[in-house]
């Protein structure tokens, strides 16, 4: 069933969207949110495991990001399979299969075991590459930005993780948490299957997985990969990193640090729908361009480490201390989370507009780039911290990546004509 049936003579914006489309959107968003809770759980569990296993910052980064790697690598094949078999089937199978490694986490005792299991568990992170093309096919082009923004709000699972996981950990111990989440995946699979509908685009696009790489010849794909590596990669990495940052930098408890960290994750999730609506209204380029500038300013302020100045005056010496208060940190990360949300939504508005016939494949490739960013960044955060011994180096790194994005978008989209004198 296509959304245009019965409305062929109407303008796209005036066409009635079937109730089934909204049901698919709601079911897909729920499934994605639950998957994201599971995908991000090591951001909280890892703090406890770091103490139990005696991990350094680099090992902690590796622990939290291993599952992100698999989620990134699986986005391309799952995006291709979604085009071939349909999002309903692929999402349901993914939820059921991933419940097994999630449950097995509760039996791990050594770092290498967590890493190996995390590789299998991480497949839940590829659910985004399934849901995005699946949902988009039920909506007309003029409403896809909003629809994909609502679906993308499933990343609120990062905030749900920050609220729920610490409470479960304190109440029952960390080994019970993955068992509860495994059951949640199975229950979600049943709900999703009952509330969703057959994919209208299933089976319409053939070709092998190798054929999917042909779209890499288009330079627009590479540009979108770079945008998404900072928007989604930065969001994912900081969602994993900020709880322990707050705990160590400001001496908070894990529950308190996780609650404050939600000030970043929550807007980075729920405002994604607004980012999609703004992309529909003003275009993906405008939202991406101005969002990057806001991120650049926020990261510049967050990058500055606590510093003591000694000033020599005619009356002696005067001390000046500069540091980021908790309120300032929460406010800036709130803004950063919001612009990352806008950036994630605008990137896939680009995808829907520029690649309507290869949406599943391009979604998988761009999602792969974002997931790789989410995998590499926590490890780099840990390496920089172990080397420089300055916690704000994580924001310094992101600041540099945003600079690259701004230069790239200026050269390829803003400066459309040569400068003449």
What role is predicted for each listed range?
Residues 117-154:
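Cytoplasmic helix-loop-helix junction between adjacent transmembrane helices
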Residues 285-347:
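C-terminal transmembrane helical hairpin of 12-TM major facilitator-type secondary transporters
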Residues 73-111:
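Conserved MFS/SLC helix-loop-helix module at the cytosolic interface between two early adjacent transmembrane helices
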Residues 182-203, 405-413:
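C-terminal membrane-cytosol helix-exit motif in multi-pass small-molecule transporters
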Residues 42-43, 219-269:
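Extracytoplasmic gate region of multi-pass secondary transporters
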Residues 150-196:
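Helix-loop-helix hairpin linking two adjacent transmembrane segments in secondary transporters
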Residues 23-57, 238-243, 377:
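Extracytoplasmic
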Residues 144-163, 367-377:
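Glycine-rich segments within core transmembrane alpha-helices of 12-TM secondary carriers
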């Amino acid at each position: 069933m296509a959304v245009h049936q019965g409305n062929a003579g109407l303008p796209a914006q005036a066409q009635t969207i079937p109730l089934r489309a909204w049901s698919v959107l709601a079911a897909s968003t729920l499934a994605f949110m639950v998957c994201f809770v599971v995908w991000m759980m090591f951001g909280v569990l890892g703090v406890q495991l770091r103490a139990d296993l005696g991990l350094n910052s680099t090992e902690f980064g590796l622990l939290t990001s291993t599952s992100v790697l698999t989620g990134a690598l699986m986005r391309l094949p799952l995006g291709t399979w979604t085009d071939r078999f349909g999002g309903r089937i692929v999402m349901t199978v993914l939820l059921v299969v991933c419940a097994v490694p999630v449950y097995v986490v509760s039996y791990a005792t050594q770092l290498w075991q967590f890493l190996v299991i995390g590789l299998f568990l991480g497949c839940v992170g590829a659910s985004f590459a399934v849901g995005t093309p699946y949902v988009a096919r039920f909506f007309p082009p003029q409403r896809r930005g909003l629809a994909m923004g609502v679906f993308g709000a499933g990343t609120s699972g990062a905030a749900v993780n920050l609220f729920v996981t610490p409470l479960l950990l304190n109440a029952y111990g960390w080994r019970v948490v993955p068992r509860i989440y495994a059951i949640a995946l199975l229950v979600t699979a049943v709900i999703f299957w009952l509330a969703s509908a057959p994919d209208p685009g299933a089976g319409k696009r053939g070709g092998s997985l190798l054929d999917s790489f042909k779209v890499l010849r288009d330079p627009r794909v590479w540009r979108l990969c770079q945008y998404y590596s900072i928007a989604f990669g930065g969001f994912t990495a900081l969602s994993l990193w900020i709880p322990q940052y707050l705990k160590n930098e400001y001496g908070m408890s894990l529950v308190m640090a996780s609650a404050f960290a939600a000030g970043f994750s929550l807007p980075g999730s729920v405002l994604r729908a607004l980012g999609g609506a703004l992309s529909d209204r003003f275009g993906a380029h405008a939202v991406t361009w101005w969002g990057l500038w806001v991120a650049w300013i926020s990261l510049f302020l967050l990058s500055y480490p606590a510093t003591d100045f000694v000033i020599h005056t005619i009356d002696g010496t005067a001390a000046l201390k500069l540091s980021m208060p908790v309120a300032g940190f929460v406010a800036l990360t709130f803004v950063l989370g919001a612009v990352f949300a806008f950036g994630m939504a605008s990137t896939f508005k680009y995808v829907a507009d520029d690649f309507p016939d290869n949406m599943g494949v391009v979604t998988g490739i761009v999602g792969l780039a974002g997931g790789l960013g989410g995998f590499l960044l926590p490890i780099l955060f840990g390496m920089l911290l172990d080397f420089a011994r300055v916690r704000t180096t994580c924001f310094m790194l992101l600041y540099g990546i945003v600079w690259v994005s701004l230069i790239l978008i200026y050269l390829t989209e803003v400066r459309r004509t040569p400068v003449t004198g």
